[in-house]
Amino acid sequence: MKQTSLALAITALLSTLPSALVQANEGCAPLTGKESGMDIGRSSTERCLPGANPLQDQQWYLLNSGQDGFSARGGIAGNDLNLWWAHRTGVLGQGVNVAVVDDGLAIAHPDLADNVRPGSKNVVTGSDDPTPTDPDTAHGTSVSGIIAAVDNAIGTKGIAPRAQLQGFNLLDDNSQQLQKDWLYALGDSNASRDNRVFNQSYGMSVVDPRSANSLDQSQLDRLFEQQTLKAQGAAYIKAAGNGFNKIAAGGYVLNRTGNGPKLPFENSNLDPSNSNFWNLVVSALNADGVRSSYSSVGSNIFLSATGGEYGTDTPAMVTTDLPGCDMGYNRTDDPSTNRLHGNSQLDASCDYNGVMNGTSSATPSTSGAMALLMSAYPDLSVRDLRDLLARSATRVDAKHQPVMVSYTSSTGKVRDVKGLEGWERNAAGMWFSPTYGFGLIDVNKALELAANHQPLPPLVQLPWQKINVTGSAAAIADVGNSPTSSTTRIATPLTVEAVQVMVSLDHQRLPDLLIELVSPAGTRSILLSPFNSLVGQSLDQQQLGFVRTKGLRDMRMLSNKFYGESAQGTWRLEVTDVANGTRQVSLLNRETRERTTLTERNNRQPGKLISWSLRVLGHDANRS
């Protein structure tokens, strides 16, 4: 059964709102959603944003006109979430509850208070007020403003300015981060269960591989599955990570030195929670319409969203801050060159900041966009909403090219292989990039597609299919002439929504490895790019406190690249060792500021592929 037409959905929404709630600048009047033939794209002559909020004109993520966000220069017009038509037609996130699981939420902030609903929790004190007392704990408050700052002519405007917020301060420095508190905040409590969006602007950086089979991770996976698949289910939005160039781990900041291929140091698949199908993982885009310099990437990326840069040379995100000039990112003594900061005339109370960034900003950008879609189409499943966002996304940075890795094999043959793909089209016609996922969110287009959307058939989760690899077929040659490969066959006629892989192998220098999955249609997806942050084997265990590992043990990775393809047929895993030279990693001690250099020496013996497992999630191909 088709959904109600968009015009009817918007008319119904407008009928519930007092006209004063849609504040309009002169020349940006409300629309009915019934206007015939209107261009609702990023270059439309009708493009404008309602609202009289004094900082709104610098919120490029709402409507990018090339403004500078109080930095040295502006971005390129049009690189935004394209939500102006949604706002002009009254789609504002009404009726949608959003949980911000972060370091806190200033619930009395003048630009947030009217959108904060009961049910927040301070896991440190046990109270229902997660307002931070530490002046450096402003992250969650800034995240909240991006999602749902009130359209009240005070400061900024949220992406979904009528959505309702709860805050849970799991990331507070004094939080013990107990599993029971994570479960409580993420939907396993009466207080949080009715949230339709869970914003997770956090992640994990690792130097040694982590298994996704821990009890804690398994509990969260089951909870996310239950909450996602229920009627009017919940969307879990997750940050990809900020480790493209460097990571923080074990008291150190690590980055690779030298002039090697421009590959991510932190592949987003290295965080076990990022290979969870139920998490919609997001990379960050800047105001110029390309990957934010810090953003982690990988085959698990579903979408890209606005995250910005650092707010000095080029725009970050203008949003709410802890109130007061002695709290948060914006303080009287703030050394930032962002013009909003330091007791500026525009923000004399220092209640806002112009330096919020990271995939921590791309995540609430996505949460806000999801809230807008849920507001207009409350009965669509989360899987349907994900499908709409994927099919409507914009292929930004269209000339984005693959990163090539060249090496000389053990027999003297020069091999050129892809270390990371650019934009590629899969066998189902879907464009995908591990940098941008399916592309930049386009709210207006997603709403337009929703009017005639056919709901997806029920989700089918095939059981894990394990393949043991033995004998000579298991050997991973040092800079081999060809990859080590293993195959398995799926007989079920399934249309793919995502594919998960778990890999176990032995190898003495894991960052040498390129791991790829090839579908029955021949589409290739790089699950793990080489020269990554898995440098724990090379670290001095006693000096730095890292634990050595023999290799990967059931390390889970996810790919969205096969979306819409047929699962039926032969799947192939390929593992290639692409390097044998000596490399170096720089380590900065975060406490002493002492810098040392780590030498990564080549493996002394070939690696070994022990086993791998495959799971496909999708729906009945005969009902697509």
From Swiss-Prot:
Cofactor note: Binds 3 calcium ions per subunit.
Activity across pH: Optimum pH is 7.5.
Family matches, as CDD domains: Peptidases_S8_Protein_convertases_Kexins_Furin-like
S-S pairs: 28-48, 325-350
Gene Ontology BP term (one): protein processing
Reaction catalysis annotation: Cleavage of -Lys-Lys-|-Xaa and -Lys-Arg-|-Xaa bonds
Occurrences of domain P/Homo B (ranges): 456-622
Active site, UniProt feature: 102, 139, 360
Binding site for Ca(2+) 3: 478, 512, 577, 579, 602-603
Transmembrane segments: none
Domain Peptidase S8: start-end pairs: 59-421
Phenotype of null mutants: Disruption mutant releases negligible serine protease activity and does not affect plasma clotting.
MF terms in GO: metal ion binding; serine-type endopeptidase activity
One GO CC term on file: endomembrane system
Protein known as: Aeromonas extracellular serine protease
Organism per entry: Aeromonas sobria
Gene: asp
